Amino acid sequence: MKGKLYTKKGDGGKTSLFSGRRAEKFDPRVAAVGDLDELSASIGLARVAYPPSNDLLRSIQRALYVISAIVSAEQRAIDVKFDATEVEALEIEIDRVTAALPELREFIFPGEAEPSCRLHLARAVARRAERGIAGLAEPAPPEAVLAYLNRLSDLLFVLARQADQSGGSTESCLRT
């Protein structure tokens, strides 16, 4: 017989971190892990809506699980590698996608087509996850984690623009 999904250990408003520490569900570290989970789900929706980015977004979801483990582990040693090479991989993708896009001279509004809207939503969730992790007290996550989330929101922005362009949508711009 399989075990039950629920344990009832969280019914009192606490949960367990990967470090083993019991924490209030409103603890900033628990909230940060929740934001990363929401980001991964948002990226999953974007993958479904914009198949050309499926493999790239799937690899990002994997990276987000590693980041979640790092954040949840606190000071506990875990056998994961997350460094500047992860950030550099995103930068390469940002540059590749940007090179094929028209120059952006105005602010754009999300909402022209579903694929770009889902990518923009994931971008906004990435920004929130970045803010939550940036606010964590000791132990702070590795610098590469914050840099990765910062680049990720940039990548999601250019992918949203690419989705609009490849789908034949015209970007809705704010005239300044």
Regions from the PLM with identified roles:
Residues 1-176:
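Phosphate/pyrophosphate-binding loop motifs in nucleotide- or prenyl diphosphate-using proteins
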